[in-house]
UniProtKB/Swiss-Prot annotation:
Species classification: Bacteria, Bacillati, Cyanobacteriota, Cyanophyceae, Oscillatoriophycideae
EC number per UniProt: 7.1.1.6
Family matches, as CDD domains: Rieske_cytochrome_b6f
Domain Rieske residue range list: 70-162
The protein, known as: Cytochrome b6-f complex iron-sulfur subunit
Encoding gene per record: petC
Length: 180
């Protein structure tokens, strides 16, 4: 084979070298293509809101659409959604049929049970050891030592609920939040 360059110190690319490079490139492309789904599996899906929050999800894992949600939930209703860090979080419907500006983390501060909302008694009652919380999640009867944690709940532009961390003063106790 003749060289295309005028310099004798530039080796030419032989047919064998070209086929070897082609084979290595094909093998590398196939390997990378096979690794793509494996790598994608380990990266969590982005479900965040604009401000670093988490979009609330229902029991089936679907995003909660506020307009649909308010058609099936009335004022004073509290229902569970998947919130920050995957914790069950109550979405609160206000008296004027809007979503409250806060959500209530449903994890009991005593031993970590999920605390259900008792509509008949208008309070949260822990089934594990009897702790009770008022409608805002403030502890009213032990053995739980602290009130339920709060999160900010905001309706996004695309009509979904975004939960973000609550770092301000706890409006129920006028103290710094213990969970922040």
């Amino acid at each position: 084979m003749t060289q295309l360059s005028g310099s004798s110190d530039v080796p030419d690319l032989g047919r064998r070298q070209f086929l070897n490079l082609l084979w290595v490139g094909t093998a590398a492309g196939t390997a990378l293509g096979g690794l793509y789904p494996v790598i994608k599996y380990f990266i969590p899906p982005s479900s965040g809101g604009a401000g670093g929050g988490v979009i609330a999800k229902d029991a089936l894992g679907n995003d909660i659409i506020v307009s649909d949600y308010l058609q099936t939930h009335t004022a004073g209703d509290r229902s569970l959604a998947q919130g920050l860090k995957g914790d069950p979080t109550y979405v609160v419907v206000e008296g004027d049929n809007t979503i409250s500006s806060y959500g209530i983390n449903a994890i009991c501060t005593h031993l970590g049970c999920v605390v259900p909302w008792n509509t008949a008694e208008n309070k949260f009652m822990c089934p594990c050891h009897g702790s009770q919380y008022d409608e805002t999640g403030k502890v009213v009867r032990g053995p739980a030592p602290l009130s339920l944690a709060l999160v900010h709940a905001e309706v996004t532009e695309d009509d979904k609920i975004s939960f973000t961390d609550w770092t301000e003063t706890d409006f129920r106790t006028d103290e710094a939040p213990w969970w922040a």
